[in-house]
Amino acid sequence: EGEYLIFFSEHPQIGTRNFSEEEKGLVRKLYDLSTEDAGMVKAIEVKGYGQIKPTNHDVKAVEYFMKECLKGTSLEDSLEWIHFALTSEDVNNLAYGLMLSDALREVVLPAIGEVYRAIEWLAQTYKDVPLLARTHGQSASPTTFGKEFKVFSSRIKRQLDQLNDSEILVKLNGATGNYNAHAVAYPQVDWLNFTSDFIRKFNTEGRIKLIPNLITTQIEPHDSYVELFDNMRRLNIIMIGFNQDLWRYISDEWVTQKPADGEVGSSTMPHKINPIDFENSEGNLGIANALFDYFSRKLPISRLQRDLSDSTVEKNFGVAFA
C-alpha cells in the first residue's frame, strides 16, 4: 500500500502531487509496525477504533490505519489516494509474493544449501568406505558409504537449483483483472507498463523474482505458488528417504551416534541413544508435505472471477515452511 502510494506520486500522468523525500519517509515509517500498531489494525477490523466502525475486512483496516497515522501530516491532502483502484488481492498477492521470496532467500535456500554441503562432504569423505548394499532388504552387491550419500546430495542439488530459479507471479490489475477503475480515471496512462514497472522495483539482487502476470481474474491463479510448493515437496521427500536410510544404518550399527552431554536416550533404558533427530525430521517433513500437497491442489482453483477460500489457506504457508 505504501510503495504503491509513493509510486503514484512519482507518475507524471496521475493526479497525485509529488511527495517530498521527507513525506516518502513518513509513509515508509509505517512499515515498522509495533505491537500497538498491529493491535490498532485488528481493532479497526473487529470492533472499530475511534470514529471508525469495524470493517470486518483486514485490508480495509490497513487502509484506515494508514490514513489515521498520516492525519495531521503534510500528506493529509493525499490520504484518499491510498488504495486507489486496488482490490485487496492486489495488495495481498504482492505481500505474499514478497514474504515467500524473502523466506526462500533468507531462510530456506541457506538451510537447504547447508544440508546439501554437509551430505556432499560425507559423500567425498567416505567415498572409499565399503558398505554392504541391500536390495529388497536383503544382502546385495557392495557399495560405498560415500556413493550412497552422493545419491542424496545429487538429488538435493537438482531440486535446489530449480528452487533457486523459481519465479513468483503476481498481479496488480484491479477488481476483476481488467483495470476498470484505472482506465476510467486515467485512460491516458499505460497501466500495463505501470504494473510491470511497479512490480519489478521489488526485484532486488538475490531475491526470488516477482513476475507481473497481466492476464488474471481478481486473483493471480497461484500456478507459480504450486510450482514452488511442489519443488519443496520433492525436496522434503528426498530428505524423508535420507532420514529413513540413516535410521537403518544406525539400527544396523554402521553409523554410531554420539550423545550430547547430559542427554538421556530413554526414561527407562539409559544405555540407548535413539535417532530422534532423524525421526522428528521425518515426521515434520511429512506434516509439511501434507500442507504443500493441499496448497497445490487447492490454490489453482477459484470459482469464476474469485472466491475467498484461498485466503484462509494462504495464512498457513508459514506452518508448512516452519
Regions of interest found by a model, annotated:
Residues 6, 10, 248, 252, ...:
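Short, well-ordered loop/turn and helix-capping segments at boundaries between secondary-structure elements
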Residues 1-182, 186-199, 265-266, 276-282:
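A helix-coil-helix interface module used to build multimeric assemblies
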Residues 100-101, 108, 149, 221, ...:
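Amphipathic alpha-helical coiled-coil segments and their boundaries
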Residues 287-322:
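Long, amphipathic alpha-helical stalk/connector segments used for oligomerization, subunit docking
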Residues 174-177, 259-264, 305, 309-312:
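A glycine-rich phosphate-binding loop feature that marks nucleotide/adenosyl-phosphate handling sites
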Residues 186-289:
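Acidic, glycine-rich loop-and-beta core segments that form the ion-binding/anion-interacting portion
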